[in-house]
From Swiss-Prot:
Cysteine disulfide links: none
Keyword Cell membrane: yes
Entry protein name: Gasdermin bGSDM
Domain of life: Bacteria
Entry's Gene Ontology cellular component terms: cytoplasm; plasma membrane
Residues passing through the membrane, by range: 74-90, 102-120, 168-185, 194-210
Family membership noted in the UniProt record: Belongs to the bacterial gasdermin family.
Keywords in alphabetical order: Antiviral defense, Cell inner membrane, Cell membrane, Cytoplasm, Lipoprotein, Membrane, Palmitate, Transmembrane, Transmembrane beta strand
Covalently lipidated residues, kind S-palmitoyl cysteine: 7
Post-translational modifications reported in the UniProt record: Palmitoylation helps stabilize the inactive state; may self palmitoylate. Palmitoylation plays a significant role in pore formation.
GO BP annotations, alphabetical order: defense response to virus
Phenotype upon loss of function: When deleted from its operon, no longer protects E.coli against bacteriophages T4, T5 or T6.
Record note on domains: The N-terminus has marked structural similarity to the mammalian gasdermin N-terminal domain. The C-terminal region wraps around the twisted beta sheet core, probably stabilizing the inactive state.
């Protein structure tokens, strides 16, 4: 899981090696076949396929999403050590997404100088590219979706094709001397409430696992849709690797798609 744009984070290489891009702040409600739109060099959620495209009466249905299945074995998915202020900001977002309370979290990590995150027991969902391609070729843009039609004509719309998620996230803390810091599990559990389970993920007590009822998506794959005169023409695969939304070039260079990065801060505005 990568948090900092532009930092050398080992998790980026691990996810990139499996063809995935990084969700900066993991979330539960990102899934395959959702549409994203590039706006001001950021990707924001646009809607579902059937919110924009009308399926042909004699054409293929909307592509299904696979059931949960074990994700790829990703070694080195630990994030870089984050300054405690930034790390706790991320942790509060994760705990909230898992269904817990964030009151008292800062006090539980009062002695920490840095925080590190790691995913465990990953799950994967996907929708077949061939089925997405067939559906788009046969369907039509809803005539009432005028703004979306303009976005499609400008090749600003993406389809999520695969997601990688985890129900358990490990958090480690270090003190100002970069030594592993023991964490008080009862204090943390009292702070976040019963909706999120915690347990020691290391014998030293310096790593705590947070587990909620709903897995959080931390990696994704997507394709960029290419339209011409209101009709779907083709799609372009989005290269894996990176976290900075500003790295997405809006012109879609002919020498291959650049890395595409999901900017979660922008997506949070859609809530």
């Amino acid at each position: 899981m990568s948090i900092l744009p532009g930092c050398k984070d080992p998790s980026l290489s691990a996810l990139k090696s499996k063809g995935y891009n990084v969700v900066q702040l993991p979330r539960a409600d990102l899934r395959p076949t959702q549409l994203l739109v590039e706006k001001s060099k950021r990707l924001q959620r646009l809607g579902e396929l059937l919110s924009v495209f009308d399926a042909a009466a004699d054409g293929p249905p909307a592509p299904p999403v696979s059931a949960d299945r074990p994700g790829p074995n990703i070694a080195g998915t630990q994030s870089a050590d984050l300054d405690v202020d930034l790390g706790l900001s991320v942790l509060r977002g994760i705990i909230s997404a898992l269904g817990g309370s964030t009151l008292g979290v800062d006090a539980a990590f009062a002695r920490a100088a840095t925080v590190q995150f790691e995913f465990s027991s990953t799950l994967e969902n996907n929708s077949e590219l061939a089925l997405i391609d067939r559906f788009l070729a046969a369907s039509r843009v809803n005539p009432h979706a005028r703004a979306v039609a303009e976005m499609l004509e400008q090749d600003q719309v993406y389809v999520v094709t695969s997601t990688l998620k985890a129900q358990r996230i490990n958090v480690a803390a270090k003190d100002s001397n970069k030594q592993s810091l023991g964490l008080n599990l009862p204090v943390i559990q009292d702070a976040i409430g019963a909706n999120v389970k915690i347990a020691a993920a290391a014998a030293s007590g310096s790593t705590v696992s947070f587990e909620g009822a709903v897995p959080l998506v931390f990696g994704f794959q997507a394709v960029r849709l290419i339209f011409e005169q209101g009709r779907y023409r083709t799609m372009r695969l989005v290269d894996a690797g990176g976290v900075v939304a500003e790295a997405v070039r809006p012109d879609g260079a002919a020498d291959g798609e650049p890395p595409c990065y999901l900017d979660v801060e922008a997506m949070l505005l859609d809530r």
